[in-house]
């Protein structure tokens, strides 16, 4: 099974430890970045994880930023992706078993590393339990998706990166 992982610069160290853990558990890891602590934008990596899962390049995905909020929202914008921002085992299992979530997101600065590993392991092993009600709920979620051709452009974030490089954004 191949797991796509991605993060922003705030939690690169946590992502690298998760990558090592997943490999030790026997999973193939597709690391879409970021790879260092140079300031970057979480939507880039949420989108990359989402696209890897949506295209079938990866079976499941894990996203992380400081709080998990931004990157989970970015991943959820990719058609075919159902991302759950979780901080506990119950939410992670519910998202996979009932809503067939295919990406799980975390606040790497919020949740402890060992709990994160346990949740990711359980999320990967959990099985979707299809029921008529679950199928209807997922169909309603899928109906909300609208394909945006601009979003598929690999240069979608270039404008924002140029602004960052000019110093238009400040922490």
Swiss-Prot record:
Name of the coding gene: lacB
- Report the protein name in the record: Galactose-6-phosphate isomerase subunit LacB
What is the top EC class of this enzyme, as a single word?
isomerase
Q: What terms describe the molecular function in GO for this protein?
A: galactose-6-phosphate isomerase activity; ribose-5-phosphate isomerase activity
Protein's pathway: Carbohydrate metabolism; D-galactose 6-phosphate degradation; D-tagatose 6-phosphate from D-galactose 6-phosphate: step 1/1
Output the InterPro entries linked to this UniProt entry: LacB (IPR004784), RpiB_LacA_LacB (IPR003500), RpiB_LacA_LacB_sf (IPR036569)
Per the record, the coiled-coil ranges are: none
SUPFAM superfamilies assigned to the protein according to its UniProt record, in alphabetical order: Ribose/Galactose isomerase RpiB/AlsB
């Amino acid at each position: 099974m191949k797991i796509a992982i991605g993060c922003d610069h705030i939690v690169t160290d946590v992502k690298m430890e998760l990558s090592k853990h997943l490999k030790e558990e026997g999973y193939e890891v597709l690391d879409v970045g970021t790879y260092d602590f140079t300031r970057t934008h979480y939507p880039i990596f949420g989108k990359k994880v989402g696209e890897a899962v949506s295209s079938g390049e990866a079976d499941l995905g894990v996203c992380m930023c400081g709080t998990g909020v931004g990157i989970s929202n970015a991943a959820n914008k990719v058609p075919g992706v159902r991302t759950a921002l979780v901080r506990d085992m119950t939410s992670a299992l519910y998202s996979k078993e009932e809503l067939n979530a295919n990406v799980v997101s975390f606040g790497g600065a919020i949740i402890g590393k060992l709990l994160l590993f346990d949740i990711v392991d359980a999320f990967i092993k959990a099985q979707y339990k299809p029921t008529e009600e679950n199928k209807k709920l997922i169909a309603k979620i899928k109906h909300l998706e609208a394909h945006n051709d601009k979003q598929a452009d690999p240069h979608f974030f270039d404008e924002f990166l140029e602004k960052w490089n000019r110093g238009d954004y400040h922490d």
